[in-house]
Regions:
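Generic structural marker for isolated residues within well-ordered, non-membrane alpha-helices
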Residues: 90
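A structural signal for small-residue-enriched, beta-sheet-centric alpha/beta enzyme cores
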Residues: 1-84, 94-383
């Protein structure tokens, strides 16, 4: 179950020496074709990392032969030398695979403002290219982890075609992708414009709705590569739906492993005048530290939910708002509903349902609680 499940892909993960302790920290994913179509979406942070700059440029023509990824260093805020380092990573990968550097995307994750150890990385790329195999997907997924505790992978099987994916990201999760590196592969025979449209829609309903801590990374990257090796061209809508489902699976895995969390929270907003309103309300609640602390404390504090809703520009009437926690409607018509003592928040998963009674649109935002461990982990994370 990995990026090498679809036909036409190989991968590898190696310990290049970027991290301490002989941990896997560099990965290569290679597309063997016969098609080399690709698409990408990236962080909307205006302070973006050198590998984001590089990858935006090379994916613009809709063609990729490989992706090289490293953890242990973001290569962000490193100036012109950092961009040259990203290019050198692509060049080394291209040399190892016999392709052009302009056909290789680059992704990095880790500390900001630190140059990468290029001697170790170049050597690691050489070894990774030599070790590429159909069995290398698990090592590749492990190599891109930073504060993640488990690798994130998913697969979808269509009629004669498939999609595979791997992701990393445990902190700085916020709409706009989420400190994420995601590589998606498919053996469907699709052209780049179809991939681009599908990826943007899939990201919109998945990664863009994951919001652990409201912080947007400099390095967010989601790449989709198609080998065409199956020879099957699925209907574009069928493919988009399948890709969206797989990305939602990966987004849930990211939230489940978010730094220091003790609850995974799904904030479902219904009865909105527009999808934008539903997303806006969900995100505002998800970013409320008071709300997140209440969940951590096992308190279904619907007042904090209403307070967060009230600062948005969404269409609603305050005396028509309903809020439920895990199926118990604790707020009805903007006031007191069922006793909050009926709500059980002892489990890891929490479902918050907000009905605006203003229309038919809906959206679900995924988030986490705010814990002592989250503060400790981020306070101790080296800068």
């Amino acid at each position: 179950m990995s990026v090498t499940t679809p036909a036409g892909f190989t991968a590898a993960g190696v310990a290049a020496g970027i991290k301490t302790g002989d941990r896997l920290d560099l990965a290569v994913v290679s597309n063997l074709g016969p098609r080399f179509a690709a698409a990408g979406v990236f962080t909307r942070n205006r302070v973006f990392a050198a590998p984001v700059d590089w990858s935006r440029r090379v994916v613009a023509d809709g063609r990729l032969r490989a992706v090289v990824l490293n953890s242990g260093g973001a290569n962000a805020c490193t100036g012109r030398p950092g961009f040259e380092d990203a290019g050198a990573m692509a060049e080394a990968t291209a040399t190892g695979l016999g392709v052009r550097a302009g056909e290789v995307a680059v992704c990095s994750t880790g500390l900001i403002g630190v140059r990468l150890p290029m001697a170790e990385i170049t050597s690691g790329i050489e070894r990774a290219c030599a070790q590429l195999s159909r069995d290398g997907g698990e090592d590749a997924a492990t190599a891109i982890m930073t504060t993640d505790t488990v690798s994130k992978q998913a697969v979808h099987h269509g009629e004669g075609w498939s999609i595979g994916g791997m992701a990393k990201g445990a902190g700085m999760l916020a709409p706009g992708l989420a400190t994420m590196l995601v590589v998606l592969t498919t053996d469907a025979d699709l052209e780049a414009p179809v991939l681009d449209a599908a990826l943007r829609e899939a990201s919109r309903i998945s990664f863009d709705r994951a919001d652990a801590d409201g912080c947007m990374s400099t390095n967010d990257t989601v790449l989709l590569l198609a080998s065409g090796a199956s020879g099957v061209t699925p209907d574009s809508q069928e493919f988009t739906t399948a890709l969206g489902g797989l990305c939602q699976d990966l987004a849930r895995q990211l939230i489940a492993d978010a730094e220091g969390s003790s609850h995974e929270i799904a904030i479902e907003v219904v009865g909105a005048a527009s999808v934008r309103d539903a997303e806006t309300v969900g995100r505002e609640v998800a970013r409320s530290n008071l709300f997140k602390c209440a969940i951590f404390g096992g308190d279904p504090n619907w007042g904090r939910v209403l307070s967060a809703i009230g600062v948005t520009d969404a269409v609603f009437e305050a005396d028509r708002l309903d809020v439920s926690f895990n199926g118990v409607q604790v707020c009805r018509d903007g006031g007191i509903g069922e006793p909050r003592e009926l709500v059980d928040l002892s489990g890891r998963r929490v479902h918050v349902l907000i009905d605006l009674h203003a229309g038919d649109a809906a959206a679900t935002i995924l988030t986490t609680d705010l814990t002592y461990e989250y503060v400790k982990e981020n306070a101790e994370y080296s800068s």
